[in-house]
Amino acid sequence: MRVAVSGAAGRMGRLVVKNAVAEGLKVVQAFDINEVGKDAGELAGVGKIGVPIEDDISKLDADVLIDFTTAEAAMKNAEVAAEKGVRVVMGTTGFTDEDRKRLAELAEKVPMIVSPNFSLGVNIFWKIVEYAAKMLYEWDAEIVELHHRHKRDSPSGTALKLAEIIRKVKEEKGIEADLKTCREGISPRESEIGVFGIRGGDVVGEHTVFFFGSGERIELTHRAMSRECFAIGAVRAAKWIAKVDKPGFYTMDDFLE
């Protein structure tokens, strides 16, 4: 199985290269606008693999592309991959609704798995939160997420998915709940789901969902201790999508099932 990695010089990209090599996959291309010409394996700490970093995605030639870049770059990369018939594992976040619509259109050409978080723990966490939301749909729900100071998007894609899970459950129970990403001044709490992002230091990622009842509350938390969990999940998703013949917009639920 031939794998290309876009964003290969970044924090996540290096870990993807490292774990792809560890899983016995053949990394054949590595794309980034930084560290051009350097060996992707050396950057990943696994020694030379004979794959230099290049910055021209139009040269893409692989079975699967694993993307951890920026939303803008990822959209271009997905366009090229779809045109060339290359399957896509998309770990980039920060997409607009229009971007997601376009990704779904591109997925009509090639199998594509898109997730704001490839960690197995987070995907189980989503299921736990959904179960709790069904039991506690009348309770107030708030989400707080913490990430390192360099994270580009806020709230995180993982937090937004948590909010969407809770919103859908409430909607099924006849409760309208809007997403609230900031509050200012003093006002009564309306039917809403608050999502708040904190940025600082080198926090890999932490998400806490609060359910507030009368005289009690439940807190559910997932903490990523290392980015390794995201890379491992993405590489395993790549091995899965490589065996999928039917084009489509797949999620981690499809992979886990």
UniProtKB/Swiss-Prot annotation:
Keywords: Amino-acid biosynthesis, Cytoplasm, Diaminopimelate biosynthesis, Lysine biosynthesis, NAD, NADP, Oxidoreductase
PROSITE patterns recorded: DAPB
UniProt xrefs under Pfam families: DapB_C (PF05173), DapB_N (PF01113)
Domain of life: Archaea
List of residues binding NAD(+): G7, A8, A9, G10, R11, M12, D32, G91, T92, T93, S115, P116, N117, F118
EC number per UniProt: 1.17.1.8
Gene3D superfamilies (UniProt xref): Dihydrodipicolinate Reductase, domain 2 (3.30.360.10), NAD(P)-binding Rossmann-like Domain (3.40.50.720)
Active-site annotation: H147, K151
Catalytic activity: (S)-2,3,4,5-tetrahydrodipicolinate + NAD(+) + H2O = (2S,4S)-4-hydroxy-2,3,4,5-tetrahydrodipicolinate + NADH + H(+); (S)-2,3,4,5-tetrahydrodipicolinate + NADP(+) + H2O = (2S,4S)-4-hydroxy-2,3,4,5-tetrahydrodipicolinate + NADPH + H(+)
Binding residue positions for (S)-2,3,4,5-tetrahydrodipicolinate: H148, G157, T158
Associated pathway: Amino-acid biosynthesis; L-lysine biosynthesis via DAP pathway; (S)-tetrahydrodipicolinate from L-aspartate: step 4/4
Compartments it resides in: Cytoplasm
EC main group: oxidoreductase
GO molecular function, one term: oxidoreductase activity, acting on CH or CH2 groups, NAD or NADP as acceptor
Gene Ontology CC annotation, any one: cytoplasm
GO biological process: diaminopimelate biosynthetic process; lysine biosynthetic process via diaminopimelate
HAMAP family assigned: DapB
Role description: Catalyzes the conversion of 4-hydroxy-tetrahydrodipicolinate (HTPA) to tetrahydrodipicolinate.
Family stated for the protein in its record: Belongs to the DapB family.
Name this polypeptide is given: 4-hydroxy-tetrahydrodipicolinate reductase
Provenance organism: Archaeoglobus fulgidus (strain ATCC 49558 / DSM 4304 / JCM 9628 / NBRC 100126 / VC-16)
Primary gene name: dapB
